[in-house]
Swiss-Prot record:
Residues 349-484 are annotated as: Cytidylyltransferase. The keyword Membrane does not apply. The lineage of its organism: Bacteria, Pseudomonadati, Pseudomonadota, Alphaproteobacteria, Acetobacterales. It catalyses: D-glycero-beta-D-manno-heptose 7-phosphate + ATP = D-glycero-beta-D-manno-heptose 1,7-bisphosphate + ADP + H(+); D-glycero-beta-D-manno-heptose 1-phosphate + ATP + H(+) = ADP-D-glycero-beta-D-manno-heptose + diphosphate. This is Bifunctional protein HldE. NCBIfam families: cyt_tran_rel, rfaE_dom_I, rfaE_dom_II.
């Protein structure tokens, strides 16, 4: 996954998130409350600022539109934002309200209390005019738009309506993280991402089962004239309902949750980037689910980077397979490939006997892995090897060959086939990249036409001279004869 070419216009309520860490060791003599002995303080952008931070951490670029006060927290916020390469500060300063500041007091890795500094003043006409001007000035550079509504005033009706209408006129998708119960305010959005509670409040419908989630999402979708609703469901994962199609569920992976602060920001950031890169919403949902899984395991308003998201996707794959077996069945391999493709990953395929692993094999596997995001290796089973190589082969049985192959870092999955060629397996899996050694001509590669017809490609990898299993066996036999 590479999001470096994607720019997201982030519009919404920005705030300064302040975390004050301390220790609670006694009860106050003045009242029955704990005494917090203060230690270090950490500050970071929150609200739509955290959305932008997540976009940057995932490798994208962000343009940030919101309101800040002419005050010390506002200066601190802009100072933090100025330290982030890839971020364009399009914030509007106002003297009518303070910068929103949320201070969380933390002891023993738990929030003790939160103190909020904010104004309940409605958005003023001059503030709305300035925000709309900032949107108009920067939307031409955006590939996707995110509206992050924390119900703090920035996402007033005129701002929302203008942002969505302007984006739609340019063919730019708009993703909305809602706070309002009136989803009609987000009319025309491409995708709205409520949590389950927000979806229930917006529709007045139950959301306990998958069927109820779908019914509520369709009701919300109709009110907002939206293309899709993606509902986050905490430990139940996520549910995507699109205007055309049924409900799609991705489960959450069991983990220890330290802090859910800002998890919704991570979801919409990852979702928008993935969709902006060309993934379907279903594929983007898998990426967003993995990113959220990373940040809830961290304390405070956190972000996830690409390496963490890929590792989480791998862990989810392993969970779905019930562990990490050395050798997958054909059905398991097909399921695994489908999951990888749903995540927008390019799946590579190579095959062979791989009887005695040598440096030439490793070089081939490394080249194959460089050509894709996930590599599946198909091994000839023992009977197939014997037909191809003779009755004395294989030297190592399939189970041993699979264990060795699965332990090689370039390999993501191993499957076996019993036919003389892997053609039927290739038809089943439909890899994006088919890799063979450069000793083959393109017209000699089994399955090349199948892969190309499906939009994939064939890669011929260079081989290392003088490296082969047959030669290795010959040297072993010669050495054994010399010892006798």
């Amino acid at each position: 996954m590479d999001f470096s070419s994607i720019t997201v216009l982030c519009i919404g309520d920005i705030m300064l998130d302040r975390f004050v860490y301390g220790e609670m060791e006694r009860i106050s003599p003045e009242a029955p409350v704990p005494v917090l002995r203060l230690g270090r303080t950490r500050e970071m952008p929150g609200g739509v600022g955290n959305v932008a931070n997540n976009i940057l951490s995932l490798g994208g670029r962000a343009i940030l539109v919101g309101l800040v006060g002419r005050d010390t927290p506002g200066q601190a916020l802009r100072g933090l934002l100025g330290q982030r390469p890839g971020l364009t500060d399009a914030l509007v300063e106002t003297g009518a309200r303070p910068t929103i500041c949320k201070t969380r007091f933390i002891a023993a890795n738990q929030q003790v209390v939160r103190a909020d500094e904010e104004s309940r003043l409605a958005l003023q006409p001059d503030e709305a005019t300035s925000l709309i001007a900032a949107i108009d000035a920067h939307i031409g550079a955006a590939d996707i738009v995110v509206l992050s509504d924390y119900a703090k005033g920035t996402c007033a009706d005129p701002v929302i309506a203008h942002a969505i209408a302007t984006a739609r006129a340019r063919g730019i998708a708009v993703f909305v993280d809602p706070k309002s119960r009136d989803f009609a305010r987000y009319r025309g959005a491409s995708c709205i991402t409520p949590n389950a509670r927000e979806l229930a409040q917006a529709t007045g419908l139950p959301i306990d089962t998958d069927a109820e989630i779908e019914q509520a999402a369709r009701a919300a979708m109709a009110r907002a004239d939206a293309v899709a609703i993606l509902a986050t469901r905490s430990e139940k994962g996520m549910a995507l309902v699109e205007r055309e199609g049924g409900v799609q569920i991705v489960p959450a992976r069991a983990r220890e949750v330290f802090d859910v602060s800002g998890a919704g920001d991570t979801v919409i950031a990852a979702l928008a980037l993935a969709a902006g890169s060309g993934m379907t919403l279903a594929q983007a949902m898998h990426v967003a689910n993995a990113a959220a899984g990373v940040v809830v395991g961290k304390l405070g308003t956190a972000t996830a980077d690409i390496a963490e998201v890929l590792a989480e996707l791998n862990a989810q794959d392993a969970d779905a397979m019930g562990g990490t077996p050395s050798l997958l069945s054909r059905a398991q391999a097909a399921e695994q490939v489908a999951r990888w493709k749903a995540q927008g990953l390019r799946v590579g395929f190579t095959n062979g006997c791989f009887d005695i692993i040598h440096p030439g094999h490793v070089a081939l596997l490394a080249a194959a892995r460089r050509a894709c995001d996930r590599l599946i290796v198909a091994l000839n089973d023992d009977a197939s090897v014997a037909r191809l190589k003779g009755p004395e082969r294989p030297v190592n049985p399939l189970e041993d060959r699979a264990r060795v192959m699965a332990a090689i870092r370039h390999v993501d999955a191993v499957v076996a086939f019993g036919e003389d060629t892997p053609l039927e397996l290739i038809r089943l899996l439909l890899p994006d990249v088919l890799v063979k050694g450069a000793d083959y001509r393109p017209d000699q590669v089994v399955g090349a036409d199948v892969v190309r017809q499906a939009g994939g490609r064939v890669v011929l990898a260079d081989l290392e001279d003088g490296k082969s299993t047959t030669r290795t066996i010959g040297r072993i036999r010669a050495a054994g004869a010399a010892d006798r």
